[in-house]
Amino acid sequence: MTNLLPEMAEIWQQTLNWQPTVQQQEQFQRLYELILEGNRQLNLTRITDPQEFWEKHLWDSLRGILPLLSGNLPPASPTIIDIGTGAGFPGVPVAMTVPNCTITLLDSTQKKITFLDNILTELALTNTKTIVGRAEKIGQHPQHRMAYDIALIRAVGAVSVCAEYTLPLLKQGGLAIIYRGNWTKDETTALQNAVKLLGGVIESIEQFTTPLSHSIRHCVYLRKVATTPVQFPRPIGVPTQKPL
């Protein structure tokens, strides 16, 4: 029997002032099934319970782009890159719910990108493409540097590393959205210094509680206000070994 994702229409409405269409709900369900299938061969996610998947992969992905869902974020057809997308989060749910955007999913693992290519075909997501590569290299590539309106990244290490990965890819005025669990004031101070070096400012840091498990999460929003100096991002491995 197929595991069914919860619909959660009321919670979507209460928390994000948004609800998925019937088609989007069907896409969420199919995405869930495809990830469960892919998990047998690839280590995509340990989150497989339907409610947990809904909260930690779908709801969390869309909470970060709340300004986009509400239509308050120009331009009307944004170009978005999801850095280190892994199993496709947050990029794939964003592609489903912001159909006027174009999304690039970046990951350094070929097997994950091959899996995502199959998902995009299955879900008929024509607004989305994939790249195998590292953020340090892509950020120095003329086709990608200063090419995006929005950069998404789930922070697993130092947030200053996320800033170094995202800001070089953004156009002037672009927005980096960093998805994060815990957050401290010391991190804000450290991040301010790094962001200034990279041509950005911290626009806001939002704390929120997830609707089912009531976990504390944060989204850090960085605005690109000046050109990133040419030496950033530094070569592969350097940002993580020597965070700004």
Curated annotation (Swiss-Prot):
Subcellular location(s) of the protein: Cytoplasm
Gene3D superfamilies documented for this protein: Vaccinia Virus protein VP39
A Pfam family of this chain: GidB
Primary localisation category: cytoplasm
Chain sites annotated for binding S-adenosyl-L-methionine: G84, F89, D107, S108, T109, A135, E136, R154
Enzyme class: transferase
A GO term from the CC aspect: cytosol
UniProt keywords, alphabetically: Cytoplasm, Methyltransferase, rRNA processing, S-adenosyl-L-methionine, Transferase
E.C. designation(s): 2.1.1.-
SUPFAM superfamilies referenced in this protein's UniProt entry, alphabetically: S-adenosyl-L-methionine-dependent methyltransferases (SSF53335)
Gene Ontology MF terms in the entry: rRNA (guanine-N7-)-methyltransferase activity
Entry's family note: Belongs to the methyltransferase superfamily. RNA methyltransferase RsmG family.
Described purpose of this protein according to its UniProt entry: Specifically methylates the N7 position of a guanine in 16S rRNA.
Name of the protein described by the UniProt record: Ribosomal RNA small subunit methyltransferase G
Protein species of origin: Nostoc punctiforme (strain ATCC 29133 / PCC 73102)
